[in-house]
Regions:
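Short acidic/polar, Gly/Pro-enriched loop/turn segments located at secondary-structure boundaries
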Residues: 33-39, 43-51, 70-73
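Extracytoplasmic/periplasm-facing segments of secreted or lipoprotein envelope proteins
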Residues: 28-31, 41, 117, 157-159
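Short, surface-exposed interaction patches in beta-rich subdomains
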Residues: 18-28, 50, 56-61, 65-73, ...
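Active-site alpha-helical segments that house and flank conserved acidic catalytic motifs
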Residues: 35-37, 115, 179
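Gly/Pro-rich, low-complexity intrinsically disordered segments
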Residues: 1-23
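Extended beta-solenoid/beta-helix repeat architectures
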Residues: 106-110, 116-119, 126-140, 148-153, ...
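Conserved "repeat-terminator" motif of extracellular CCP/Sushi domains
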Residues: 83, 104-107
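Short strand-edge motifs at loop-to-beta-strand transitions and within beta-strands
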Residues: 99-101
Length: 227
């Protein structure tokens, strides 16, 4: 359904940014949800959606006309596709451009999140959400994720160019890191190196809950910390 969103357009006095809002209502009985994001350079933030909403977004975009939104529902599964409209050679640090995308998700369903973005900043606190899988494909970016412990297994896959990546994982969850990349500076405090490119926390095999992190990056600073 391409029309299931509210639209509000305005301009910011300093950045000439278009302001738009979008929303998708949660279908009754939905247990799992899939979110596909496509976007260029922007700062991506995450908040909880209002009751009754599966997904919502608040965007403030300079130099970009907005996003397209599509929603599908089948049985107990609901899918949202949210993609930035085409842009021409605009970078995040272009002078005078302000682009921020605040995503809002319902905490009830089990989520599969897939993001393909250009250069950008991404900061997500995922602790309130049941995230079974999150896949990030980015160019030059700063990625900051805080993962939770609401599922027995969660998977994180990151493919990036030049990136600063920081991931926080709970102390009570076993965690495995697989890393493939040319030039990576890494900080995996609390992990044991099993072999080249493979790291695990102590007691991983017997942990009741597990997080699997798989990264493939060009040149990155990569930190995984326990909390």
């Amino acid at each position: 359904n391409d029309d299931d969103f509210t639209y509000d357009e305005g301009t910011d006095s300093t950045s000439e940014a278009n302001h738009q809002t979008y929303k998708v209502d949660k279908v009754e009985g939905v247990k799992s949800a899939e979110l596909k994001i496509g976007g260029g350079a922007a700062r991506f933030l995450l908040e909880q959606a209002e009751p009754g909403q599966l997904f919502a977004a608040d965007t403030r975009l300079a130099g970009v006309s907005g996003f397209t939104l599509r929603e599908e529902a089948s049985g107990s599964h609901q899918k949202v596709v949210f993609k930035m409209k085409s842009q021409k050679n605009i970078r995040l640090n272009d002078k005078g451009l302000d682009r921020k995308v605040t995503l809002k998700l319902n905490t009830e369903p089990v989520w599969d999140i897939n993001m393909e973005i250009g250069a950008g900043d991404l900061k997500y606190d995922l602790t309130p959400y049941k995230v079974e899988k999150i896949t990030l494909e980015t160019g030059a970016s700063n990625i900051d994720l805080k993962l939770g412990d609401l599922l027995s297994e969660s998977n994180v896959k990151i493919e990036s160019g030049v990136a600063n990546i920081e991931i926080a994982v709970p102390e009570n969850v076993g965690c495995e890191i697989k890393m493939d990349g040319a030039l990576n500076a890494k900080n995996f405090t609390g992990f044991t190196k099993i072999k080249s490119g493979l790291y695990r926390t102590e007691g991983f095999d017997s942990a009741a809950k597990k997080i699997y992190i798989d990264t493939d990056s060009g040149m990155s600073n990569f930190t995984v910390r326990r909390y």
